Amino acid sequence: MRSEQQYIDLYTQARELICSHAPETMNAVRDEAFEDFRRQGFPSKQVERYKYTDIQKLFAPDYGVNLNRLEIPVDPYKTFRCDVPNLSTSLYFVVNDMVYRGEKGEVCGEKGVVRGERLPHSTPKLPEGVIVDSLANVFSHPSPLTSHLSKYYAKLAKTSDDAITALNTMLVQDGLFVYVPKNIKVDRAIQVINLLKATPSNAQRQVPDLMVNRRVLIVLEEGAELKMLFCDHTADDRHFLATQVIEAYVGENASLDLYCLEETHYKNVRVSNVYIDQQANSRVNHNVITLHNGITRNKLDLTFSGEGAECDCYGCVIADKQQHVDNNTLITHKVPHCTSNELYKYVLDEKATGAFAGKVLVEHGAQKTSSQMTNQNLTATKEARMYTQPMLEIYADDVKCAHGSTVGQLNDAALFYMRQRGISLSEAKLLLQNAFINEVIDKMQLEPLRDRLHYLVEKRFRGELNKCEGCKLCK
């Protein structure tokens, strides 16, 4: 049986159940997504954008899916902390695909809010008009604003173009919604902890390996400013498969800083698609940090729809054992006078594999485009493998574009120099690897997060970091 057939059968048999636990805005596009998924099937490695990751194999196992929206009786605020020292954030949790929010650790869902115990680290009040809530709550309460906002759902993430997006859209029942009104600046960063958990600690029965479908919709109106930090973690030693689709609309003169940090278990599979649309004179800073994982596949599609927009896209990957990390980016310059900059760095040890495929598309008429793409990689062993494919596709004649990639080992001369001065070989390698990765870390705008990442990266290279350093479950 083809790996996609089980998901086709699942939707056919459980469509009414899926729809009964989701708002109409999400249900309205579900059947179309199903038809697109059935038509496409999972992409093979012959498909250009998926050539480095075997998607069909990842989705072949029989995972359980929580379509009944059964709550796992766990208070994430009590069992899990992911604090960044000196970084003041508004803290939210997504446990599998259920959104926890508010001063009392409330659980958001289609039935409203389930209140929990008041917690000492309550989430501070957001600026007037700012919404951070579950999609189900927002779209289940009709108003002129929600009617306006519902038009953004599943518009960037086209199900006809990507089978993973189609699968997520047909199965997802809730998600996180973030809205910032015109000219509102959110000074305090929004921190979202994506926590995968299959069963409470006192469960007596065996729980199947779990598939989770997460969704995020971000809308920034003209002149709005927002910083968001996503931290992905696993709380159970089980196999998880997580699909994630993020849509972000960045209005004219708006600014979005987006950080995605992964510290998951080696049994975790994460497939994430991020779609960003930028209007005139907007700014986006997109950062992907993979410190610990099993198999990770990140896709970024960013489009310039208005002149004068800028984006900086940074990524750093540290992988060992048999971990696999695949980053695929497409930046489309549709209009003139836009600037894009990409820098991705990998350090691969043991039998880890990495892949970076980046493409910059400059369409007809997109004159005065400026674009720079760089991918640099270190392989610490002969068994480690890195695949790199930077690409430019240009249909305008007045542009400034460059791209390049390197794959190599640590500099022997530098190692020899440090050994001559009494530094051990292991410490010398650590210093060089840190210096290599720190070029990416130093470009991140949030200073407390930057300092924290320097600390976590060093611990990762020393082999002392297996899960989130702030997780109470790991103590």
What are these regions (language model features)?
Residues M1-A166, L343, D349:
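N-terminal amphipathic, basic helical "cap/leader" segment at the start of enzyme domains
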Residues C108-E117, K125-E128, F139-H141, L145-I423, ...:
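Conserved beta-strand/loop scaffold segments within soluble protein domains that form the structured core
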